[in-house]
Swiss-Prot record:
The keyword NAD does not apply. Forms a 24-polypeptide structural core with octahedral symmetry. Part of the 2-oxoglutarate dehydrogenase (OGDH) complex composed of E1 (2-oxoglutarate dehydrogenase), E2 (dihydrolipoamide succinyltransferase) and E3 (dihydrolipoamide dehydrogenase); the complex contains multiple copies of the three enzymatic components (E1, E2 and E3). This is Dihydrolipoyllysine-residue succinyltransferase component of 2-oxoglutarate dehydrogenase complex. Pathway: Amino-acid degradation; L-lysine degradation via saccharopine pathway; glutaryl-CoA from L-lysine: step 6/6. Binds 1 lipoyl cofactor covalently. It comes from Bartonella vinsonii subsp. berkhoffii. One of its GO terms (biological process) is tricarboxylic acid cycle. It comes from the Bacteria. The gene is sucB.
Length: 411
């Protein structure tokens, strides 16, 4: 008896997906609830599990195919088990026992990430030389860099042993090698959506960016004094994102236009704050949403940001986790960015960019002092938000961070 495998419901407004990878081959045994195939939507990656135990009987949708919700992907034959082909005696006698590293690599069916594959090709590193740290053992760029840092021996190109006489190589023979320096990789659904949405935001909104700078001394001092006690009581580390989210929520109460959106000829003002927190992953940028952030304590915000961040990096975010945001915060500072002009996350009317904290000489009470400074950037939709409102919003965020007591006193 065969059981059909169909595309599950992928969430509100998501009608199709791309078949990313089949984890099993035809005839291979599968356990109940074992992932069979990976689907890529324009928002998340979804694994479709096997509803029964048996073997993969049929594959209908090939890797790279676009499928709609409830479309037939394949079928599993319930109760059947695949039979592994036993190696011949000659093969057994010739093949040496694989090392632990080779066993780990051979069992990994995930192809290396494109950036990792490029580095491996450039440095003549075999897949068997690397243990992947990504999802299901996928080799990531960081894994290759770690191997290179350890000085792994690369595999040199094979040289014919039939002659020791140097052989001249014509330019025509080099040409195919030069062509291999480029790589064409199909864009994932997520990357296509990122590209489309960012360009649509630029084309639709009257986008403008205003800047300010903030002295992080107060926040850093507060964090240093209470980080151990905070973690002991709440079970989560005290980071910077919690302070920024609280400061943003505080400023949005005073300037609701920055938390609004346009719908046709109407402006919708939101009396709540669903803060989108931009998270970088191997497959692209995603923006999970901290719902009702304005009603949360600092500890609750930090816990929710941590939870969503882990789901994002593991590729387990649900579509609902990324819907309904009213304002976005992005922190390019974790990558070393000194300043940027963030692009709006439509249909939102504002996005705040945080950046690297750098010690700079500042004039404080007529004296030169070294202070940890950060540039802030607010990109906003000028159709809704006036310049005065945008500047005031950024000043309020600055004031809350330089004097965190204002958040407690609601000033």
């Amino acid at each position: 008896m065969t059981t059909e495998i169909r595309v599950p419901t992928l969430g509100e407004s998501v009608t199709e997906a791309t078949v990313g990878k089949w984890f099993k081959k035809l005839g291979e045994a599968v356990a109940i609830d074992e992932p069979l195939v990976e689907l890529e939507t324009d928002k998340v990656t979804v694994e479709v599990p096997s509803p029964v135990a048996g073997k993969l009987f049929e594959i209908i949708a090939k890797e790279g195919d676009t499928v709609e919700v409830n479309a037939l992907l394949g079928a599993v034959e319930a109760g059947a088990a695949s039979v592994a082909k036993s190696p011949s005696s000659s093969e057994t006698s010739v093949s040496a026992a694989p090392s632990e590293l080779e066993q780990s690599s051979s069992s990994n069916t995930m192809p290396p990430a494109p950036s990792a594959a490029k580095l491996m090709a450039e440095n003549n590193i075999a897949k068997s030389d690397i243990l992947g740290s990504g999802k299901r053992g996928q080799i990531l760029k960081e894994d290759v860099l770690n191997v290179l840092a350890q000085g792994v021996k690369t595999s040199p190109p094979a040289v014919s042993a039939s002659s020791s006489t140097p052989v001249s190589v014509s330019s025509s023979a080099v040409a195919p090698v030069q062509e291999m320096r480029e790589e064409r990789v199909r864009m994932t659904k997520l990357r296509q959506t990122i590209a489309r949405r960012l360009k649509d935001a630029q084309n639709t909104a009257a986008m403008l960016t205003t800047f300010n700078e903030v002295d992080m001394s107060a926040v850093m001092g507060l964090r240093k004094r209470y980080k151990d006690l905070f973690e002991k009581k709440h079970g989560v580390k005290l980071g910077f994102m919690g302070f920024f989210t609280k400061a943003v929520c505080h400023a949005l109460k005073e300037l609701p236009a920055v938390n609004a959106e346009i719908d046709g000829t109407d402006i919708i003002y939101k009396n709540y704050v669903n803060a989108g927190i931009a998270v970088g992953t191997d497959k692209g940028l995603v923006v999970p949403v901290v719902r009702d952030a304005d009603q949360m304590s600092l500890a609750e915000i930090e816990k929710e940001i941590g939870r969503l961040g882990r789901l994002a990096r593991d590729g387990k975010l649900a579509v609902s986790d990324m819907q309904g945001g009213t304002f976005t915060i992005t922190n390019g500072g974790v990558y070393g960015s000194l300043m940027s002009t963030p692009i709006l996350n439509a249909p939102q009317s504002g996005i705040l960019g945080m950046h690297a904290i750098k010690e700079r000489a500042m004039v404080v009470d007529g004296q030169i002092a070294i202070r940890p400074m950060m540039y802030l950037a607010l990109s906003y939709d000028h159709r809704i938000v006036d310049g005065q409102e945008a500047v005031t919003f950024l000043v309020r965020v600055k004031e809350s961070l330089e004097d965190p007591e204002r958040l407690v006193l609601d000033l």
